[in-house]
């Protein structure tokens, strides 16, 4: 089986991890990519999307990838939020219908962005080919695969019928931005109430404590300055906010707290 070729992928690799920037992990991944590309006289822009994903939080990572990747030209995107590294979980390359390549663990991390971009192929990475350590597949597998995609203008291997998707049977908090806005995994097409309706939302914290809040469903933040609001954000998810205030702190909300619309 030969290499599956493309001629329109750009020499861009993005990195998204939960590694933070106080350690050398991100630097090791970048160094590995650059070393491989140098051997083939290739160059690439390595762009950091975020390394501040909450540790082990696949939901958070999935949302952040959605907010950034679709706005790049066709390119390579390596993501590592991998709490079960070294286990039997698969590693994959997703080629999208629009020419993007997504590289990382098959644990649901690419759920949202693959859904938006459309899946053309899902390719299983043969991890043993890369002789990885048991704890750092970001450096030993995913960085290498990302570089190989640029060198070969594609990636080849065993194709899979499906990928793992995150569990969305429960509605929950998947992101809290720097303004304290609370982003849930409730999507626009699941919302049945109308603009300017007042709705009741139950928040169930991970410790089992529940609270019910009242908020107005609006189109933008400024429309209600005194009370909590709900809106559909720019990525099509229901968001709980308070104008020029930090809703997450006011409500003591954290990642993965459960959300229920009770009207």
UniProtKB/Swiss-Prot annotation:
Its EC number is 3.13.2.3. GO terms for molecular function: hydrolase activity. The record marks 82, 89, 137 as: Important for activity. Adenosine binds at residues 18, 82, 181. Keywords: Hydrolase, S-adenosyl-L-methionine. Belongs to the SAM hydrolase / SAM-dependent halogenase family. This is (R)-S-adenosyl-L-methionine hydrolase. It comes from Methanocaldococcus jannaschii (strain ATCC 43067 / DSM 2661 / JAL-1 / JCM 10045 / NBRC 100440) (Methanococcus jannaschii).
